[in-house]
Curated annotation (Swiss-Prot):
Root nodules. It comes from the Eukaryota. SUPFAM superfamilies: Globin-like. Residues 2-146 form the Globin domain. This is Leghemoglobin-3. Nitrated in effective nodules and particularly in hypoxic conditions; this mechanism may play a protective role in the symbiosis by buffering toxic peroxynitrite NO(2)(-). Nitration level decrease during nodule senescence. InterPro entries: Globin, Globin-like_sf, Globin/Proto, Leghaemoglobin-like, Leghaemoglobin_Fe_BS. Leghemoglobin that reversibly binds oxygen O(2) through a pentacoordinated heme iron. In root nodules, facilitates the diffusion of oxygen to the bacteroids while preventing the bacterial nitrogenase from being inactivated by buffering dioxygen, nitric oxide and carbon monoxide, and promoting the formation of reactive oxygen species (ROS, e.g. H(2)O(2)). This role is essential for symbiotic nitrogen fixation (SNF). It holds the Pfam family Globin. The modification Nitrated tyrosine is found at Y29, Y134. The modification Phosphoserine is found at S44.
Length: 146
């Protein structure tokens, strides 16, 4: 079974909720650094800070990550696969030293953030929709890293 209209709608609605509160981006990166403190140096907007502090660059990057997962959901529903819109993503991830375990950390942070953002609208179905979309995006990025 492919990615459904309902799954795409779940991702879209929670994406909209995510964007409404800038604190969600801080939460996302806080979770990442709790799991992988060494990853701090991979993010230019965190490298020289004492901790995770809100900034336009942090907001922009978080929205880009969540937005790409949302776009992946749309692609999965429409075509059954994900094609990167930015051909440089693989090279950027290589340059930053991203390795396979980092994708798992980001996935966990993304899913925890979405759960927090969704509040009483959270469900296993919502979680699965984000998980499937993220996994497809991560696979596409990893392929581009070769």
């Amino acid at each position: 079974m492919g990615f459904t209209d309902k799954q795409e709608a779940l991702v879209n609605s929670s994406w909209e909720s995510f964007k409404q509160n800038p604190g969600n981006s801080v939460l996302f990166y806080t979770i990442i650094l709790e799991k992988a403190p060494a990853a701090k140096g991979m993010f230019s907007f965190l490298k020289d800070s004492a901790g995770v502090q809100d900034s336009p660059k942090l907001q922009s990057h978080a929205e880009k990550v969540f937005g790409m997962v949302r776009d992946s959901a749309a692609q999965l529903r429409a075509t059954g696969g994900v094609v990167l819109g930015d051909a440089t993503l693989g090279a950027i991830h290589i340059q930053k030293g991203v390795v396979d375990p980092h994708f798992a950390v980001v996935k966990e942070a993304l899913l925890k953030t979405i759960k927090e953002v969704s509040g009483d609208k959270w469900s296993e179905e919502l979680n699965t929709a984000w998980e499937v979309a993220y996994d497809a995006l991560a696979t596409a990025i990893k392929k581009a890293m070769v």
